[in-house]
Design a protein with these regions (language model features):
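Short, acidic, small-residue-rich periplasmic hinge/interaction motif at the N-terminus
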Residues: 6, 20-22, 51-53, 65-109, ...
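Short acidic/polar hinge/loop motifs at secondary-structure boundaries
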Residues: 154-184
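Outer-membrane beta-barrel translocator/receptor signature
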Residues: 174-177, 182, 187-258, 265-272, ...
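Transmembrane beta-barrel wall of Gram-negative outer-membrane proteins
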Residues: 223-251, 261-297, 316-334, 375, ...
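Flexible loop and strand-edge segments within Gram-negative outer membrane beta-barrel domains
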Residues: 258-259, 263-267, 283-340, 346-370, ...
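Conserved C-terminal beta-signal and adjacent last beta-strands/turns
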Residues: 270, 277-281, 317, 331, ...
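Outer membrane beta-barrel strand-and-loop segments of large Gram-negative receptors
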Residues: 275, 360-376, 414-417, 509-515, ...
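Gram-negative outer-membrane beta-barrel transporters
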Residues: 426-430, 540-544, 562-654
Length: 743
């Protein structure tokens, strides 16, 4: 099949347009003549998606062999839009779900030093920080393993969700795109649909034939850390095989804040992978390997002030992840079954937390494996639609050692079966999913302590479900609702921890009697999609029974937060449960009053409350908004804007009758008189930002350079979700420069 892409206004060929055929899982880029050619395609209906920086994305439904030669026209637009269907608008396989997708120019502008930093600022998404590296995404107030982070659809196999000082072992610079999935489709990946799923898409294993060498090279620098990041990817044919090679590295020094240099925030990181597959019109089979290493610091002090319980010499984390993956898919020529696919991985993970002089305080080791088998189908007739059924299995063996560690070894086994379906009736679309999860956790160390009793095996199992409905009104308006019932088993750490965690400044104690969380969520949402107006808004209410959280333990003698029994240095946090309610709103509006000029505004707000006491839940993000004026053409872009972060004064009450402070003073109050960060309010801030970018096609290669200036006013501000906020503010003024060459 031959595809020609032209500019809708000038009718000239458009170079470097990314074309994808979803059903065939093939991707191509147009050359100097605006053409691309696809081979080994199945006959029947195919969905072609065209994306190019500076143009509105476009979707076209094709029918082979009739549409063997196709011409499509792209319209210049500065708006961040979903792909617009221009043929068969009422087709039965159209999908709608509340998702966020970052790719192209939007990904370049947002690209940060981590996945969480890249997504922060999107509606409903913020990040929890413990320095510039140890960050984690928070979706609608939920974090940890309530938010699944995947790489090409499989879990990473790291321990990022177990503590705030642990980093996600996936780099955003080499991602093709990053998706956030909510609603019924999230049940294809996990049982907790109240949070969400973040999928970093790279396609390590090529899924389609490759007929020529393609790739991308990236180089990024930033002033706040004097950091440099580089990366490259190439996909090439080697005989009958498709090969993909990728690598990236990062070298950054300590971060600069308006209050001075923040020690122990430097980082060195490498990431490399290679994938090989055989691919044809009926599917593919292949494998890949990847190696990720990182050494980074966790800040504990600034300007002579040290967080109570922190090591004066700082903490460094040294980690390595090695993973292998097999991936395959078969697509029948005809029938209701459209594909049968499977993927499995084996991951070896090691992490050491180093004190002054390279002394190992804690060492983690984990071996994990998972597999997924999915059958996708399509129906025709009165109940036309599509869906998927599948099975999933996971095994995880986590060990810990060190001079005095509170993390206990355990083995986790899990199995799931799930299904998802969607159908349409003219303007009405219905979507639903169901999943059953069984989880078994066996501790390998059962010795009780003063604070941890009744250590034993635990088994959990339950159903999760989600349903959604959308209705298309005139004038490009779509309204809908979704209802979800979610299940989450307690994590290993929540059950069995019993000791200090140096890099998170806490003595953490689990609770082997914890019950599984059970949540019920309701969403109401609306979307407007017009040529010069794009808007979406959502109201949500999530009620969680037996919500698990870490709370400071009160010392019965003093009324102050309890300190660890050995050194009386760390605040003791213990896993607790309470009925919780999380409710809020989020939205985004984009308006293009003049061609190429866009006003863009987003707002996110969430409130967490214990339903039994009506007290606020700890570690809830404040409301956050973003406004931006953007000018974008196919050749250049520019923007100015502001991030507005609200004050967070809605915090859990301090222990009754306690006289303590939230301020850390050099040589002042004793450590025991300083309240933990989650019991302290945080002021708001307004951060100005600006960006400019240039794109040129030279010798059939797209060159793009983007400059972004964050925190233009060098404002001193603090992150409410960081346990070290009383000591250290966030980064100051930062100039980021990104260069990409696509070939």
């Amino acid at each position: 099949m031959s595809v020609l892409v032209v500019d809708a206004q000038s009718q000239t060929p458009v170079v470097a347009v990314q074309l994808t055929l979803g059903e065939a899982e093939q991707a191509r880029a147009t050359g100097n003549d605006g053409r691309a050619r696809f081979t080994s395609l199945p006959m029947g209906k195919l969905t072609l998606v065209a994306r190019r920086l500076g143009y509105a994305p476009l979707t076209r439904v094709l029918q082979l062999p009739r549409d063997s030669v196709v011409t499509i026209q792209l319209r210049a637009s500065a708006m961040s839009l979903s792909a617009v269907t221009v043929q068969g608008a009422a087709r039965s396989d159209a999908t709608f779900q509340p998702t966020t997708v970052l790719d192209g120019a939007a990904l370049d502008r947002a690209l940060g030093t981590s996945i969480a930093a890249t997504l922060a600022g999107e509606p409903g998404i913020t990040q929890r920080t413990n320095g510039p590296v140890a960050t984690a995404p928070i979706i609608r107030g939920l974090g940890g393993d309530r938010v699944l982070v995947l790489e090409d659809g499989l879990r990473l196999g790291d321990i990022a969700t177990t503590a705030p000082d642990h980093a996600i072992t996936a780099d955003a610079i080499s991602a093709r795109r990053i998706e956030v999935i909510r609603g019924p489709a999230g049940l294809l990946y996990g049982s907790n649909t109240l949070g969400g799923v973040i999928n970093v898409i790279r396609e390590d294993v090529p899924r389609a034939p490759i007929d020529r060498v393609t790739g991308v090279m990236s180089l990024q620098g930033e002033s706040v850390t004097t950091g440099v990041t580089g990366g490259g990817m190439a996909a090439l044919p080697v005989g009958p095989l498709a090969v993909r090679v990728e690598g990236s590295w990062r070298d950054a020094r300590s971060s600069q804040t308006p209050a001075g240099e923040l020690p122990f925030t430097d980082q060195q990181q490498t990431d490399a992978g290679v994938g090989v597959s055989w691919a044809g019109s009926r599917g593919h089979i292949g494998s890949s390997v990847r190696r990720f290493t990182s050494e980074y610091g966790v800040p504990t002090s600034l300007g002579g002030l040290s967080l109570p319980g922190a090591h004066v010499g700082g903490i460094y984390v040294d980690l390595q992840r090695t993973s292998g993956r097999v991936d395959g898919e078969y697509r029948p020529r005809s029938g209701a079954v459209t594909s049968i696919s499977g993927a499995a991985n084996l991951v070896s993970f090691e992490q050491s937390e180093l004190e002054r002089g390279g002394f190992v305080g804690t060492r983690f080791g984990q071996l994990s494996s998972q597999g997924d088998l999915v059958m996708r189908y399509r129906r025709s007739g009165a109940l036309a639609g599509q869906g998927a059924v599948g099975v999933f299995g996971q095994w995880r063996d986590m060990r810990a050692a060190g001079s005095f560690t509170g993390t206990r070894p355990a083995v986790l086994r899990a199995a799931s079966v799930y299904g998802y379906d969607e159908m349409g009736f003219d303007r009405l679309r219905l979507m639903g999913g169901v999943r059953y999860d069984a989880v078994e956790i066996a501790p390998l160390e059962r010795t009780p302590t003063q604070l941890l009793q009744d250590v034993r095996d635990r088994r959990f199992g339950n159903w999760s479900g989600s349903a959604a409905a959308t209705y298309a009104l005139p004038a490009g308006i779509t309204v809908g609702t979704s209802v979800a019932s979610a299940f989450r088993a307690p994590a290993i750490e929540e059950l069995y921890s019993a000791g200090p965690h140096l890099a998170s400044f806490a003595y953490e104690v689990g609770n082997p009697t914890l019950r599984a969380e059970r949540g019920t969520g309701v969403d109401l949402f609306a979307r407007v999609a017009r040529q010069r107006l794009s808007a979406e808004a959502s109201l949500f209410r999530n009620a969680v029974t037996d919500f698990i959280y870490y709370a400071p333990v009160q010392d019965p003698r003093t009324g102050l937060p309890l300190r660890d029994p050995r050194l009386r240095r760390y605040v003791v946090y213990q896993a607790a449960q309470a009925p919780a309610l999380l409710q809020g709103a989020e939205g985004r509006v984009q308006v293009e009053p003049v061609t190429g000029w866009v006003g863009d505004a987003t707002l996110s707000w969430v409130q967490g409350t214990r339903r039994d006491t009506r007290d606020p839940l700890p570690a809830m993000p404040p409301w956050r908004g973003r406004v931006q004026l953007r000018r974008e053409t196919p050749r250049w872009l520019a923007s100015v804007g502001a991030d507005v972060i609200g004050a967070q004064t809605r915090i859990p009450p301090a222990p009754g009758g306690v006289s303590a402070t939230c301020t850390v003073v050099r040589g002042g109050e004793a450590e025991a008189d300083v309240l933990p960060a989650e019991l302290c309010p945080t002021p708001g801030a307004t951060l100005l930002n600006a960006s400019v970018g240039l794109r040129r096609v030279i010798a059939a290669r797209l060159h793009a350079i983007t400059l972004v200036l964050d925190n233009v006013g060098d404002v001193l501000w603090r992150d409410h979700l960081w346990r070290a906020k009383q000591v250290a503010p966030q980064s100051g003024r930062n100039l980021r420069v990104l260069y990409r060459m696509t070939f």
